[in-house]
Amino acid sequence: MNIVNGGAHANNGLRIQEFMIRPDKAKTFSEAMNICFLIIQNLKKLIKDKNFSTAVGDEGGFAPMINKNEDALNLIIKSIIKSGYVNGRDVSICLDVAANELHKNGNYSICLLYTSDAADD
């Protein structure tokens, strides 16, 4: 499920287009939806606690004004843990990096995943 938008889907500093979660622990569709709902509610609270907007991007995920992909990933990991699940076992994080957006001058560049400030870190 798509939970954070960046790239072409949002007007923020994230270069990754979609941050998603996959509820691996779920045995039924209903259980999967409940897991995702709980994580999304906790993510929303974490975003609000950082004084970011909880507005959504083009694909329905939150689109907070975050500049670093790592910061978005950390928020998602914290929301998974806060929801009582283990990241990587109960719930997996999936990414749509939109590789076509990383293509420049005939080559793919991982540096395009980061803002110029983040690339300097």
List each model region and its residues:
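Active-site-proximal beta-alpha loop/turn segments in soluble metabolic enzymes
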Residues: 18-29, 53-69, 102-112
